[in-house]
Regions:
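PAPS-dependent sulfotransferase catalytic core
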Residues: 1-84, 132, 243, 247-248
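PAPS-dependent sulfotransferases, especially Golgi type II membrane carbohydrate sulfotransferases
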Residues: 1-15, 154-205, 210-283
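Glycine-rich phosphate-binding loop used to anchor ATP phosphates in small-molecule kinases
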Residues: 82-102
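Acidic/polar short surface loop at catalytic or gating sites that assists cofactor/ion binding
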Residues: 129-173
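Short His-Asn-centered micro-motif
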Residues: 22-24, 90-95, 115-117, 207-209
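PAPS/PAP-binding and catalytic site of the sulfotransferase fold
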Residues: 28-42, 103, 107, 127, ...
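Conserved phosphate-donor/acceptor-positioning beta-strand/loop module used by diverse small-molecule
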Residues: 106-127
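Short catalytic/ligand-binding loop motif for oxyanion handling, primarily in non-cytosolic enzymes
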Residues: 29-33, 51-54, 97-100, 120-125, ...
């Protein structure tokens, strides 16, 4: 933080570009940021201050009366540093989802990117990561206030939110697939709603299945964002091959889900976020 404070007086110029990347998680944001980070005139980061970001998700989702100015200052300073040293920056995080409009007003990015991944692959990935595993259903019935879902680190404990108020007990009765699908659908809906409210900024939808291993897409990005020293197709694929953090559990694919899990999955999507198929990658 002391290093960042050196850039407090920095002023963004016309040739500085700042992208804010939003997503529900498991949607390729880390890889997307690495594409930018592969060029000398850009720096790309994802989950840069993960504990603070997870706390931001927690207090934003539960609408807790906690002043967020310190969080906004941290990211403004980080952005200033990036722009001063590298000219352009993309800051990505799945933890920004419940405060998009607020972040936009405070940080003033030049571009907003909404990273998405199809719901089946997303839920499979969250499941493999251990989301809502060993959740104490009986202990948590009828709770009226936000809880901490204890995990092996603070970031996960704060970020694995659960619904509050009247839907909570119904959510507890769902399978893990149902619980995870609620999270995916609800988080994307929050981003989608704020994304559509925001005007006078360049906004892009990016679907992972449209851009994954797509070098033509990279070439379009290279032009749009003025990448210096474009990378080769082989270098581009090497970025993809370094995707981290797949999760400790075995795969549990849609074809193996039982009928209850599939019913809950489709019900949650139809009820909360039925827009995915109609969204088009527009970069």
């Amino acid at each position: 933080f002391e290093e960042l404070k050196k850039y407090k007086s920095f002023t963004k110029e016309a040739n500085n570009k700042f992208i804010l990347s939003l997503g529900a998680g498991r949607c390729g944001q880390n890889w997307f940021a690495k594409i930018f980070n592969s060029h000398p005139n850009w720096i790309g980061t994802c989950e840069r201050f993960s504990d603070f970001e997870a706390f931001f998700r927690y207090i934003s989702f539960y609408n807790l009366p906690i002043n967020k100015d310190g969080f906004f200052e941290l990211f403004q300073l980080a952005c200033n540093r990036d722009l001063a040293k590298y000219q352009n920056t993309i800051i990505a995080s799945p933890y920004f989802a419940y405060g998009v409009e607020e972040l936009f007003k405070k940080l003033d990015p030049n571009y907003l990117v909404f990273n998405l991944r199809n719901p089946v692959k997303s839920v499979e990935s969250f499941y493999r990561k251990g989301w809502y595993l060993d959740f104490e259903t009986e202990m948590n019935k009828n709770k009226k206030s936000p809880m901490i879902n204890i995990s092996n680190n603070l970031t996960r404990a704060l970020s694995r939110i659960v619904p509050s108020e009247e839907f909570f007990n119904e959510w507890l009765s769902l399978t893990r697939i149902g619980k995870i699908t609620w999270f995916w659908a609800n988080t994307n809906k929050f981003i989608f709603d704020d994304f559509n409210k925001i005007k006078d900024v360049n906004k892009y939808f990016i679907k992972l299945e449209d851009i994954n291993e797509n070098y033509d897409f990279y070439k379009e990005m290279s032009i749009k964002f003025s990448f210096e020293k474009s990378i080769s197709k082989k270098e581009f694929y090497n970025i993809i091959n370094k995707a981290p953090n797949k999760g400790p559990l075995d795969k549990y694919e849609y074809k193996n889900w039982n009928n209850i899990e599939k019913k809950e999955f489709h019900s949650m999507i139809d009820k909360i976020f039925p827009y995915y198929d109609n969204i088009k990658t527009n970069i």
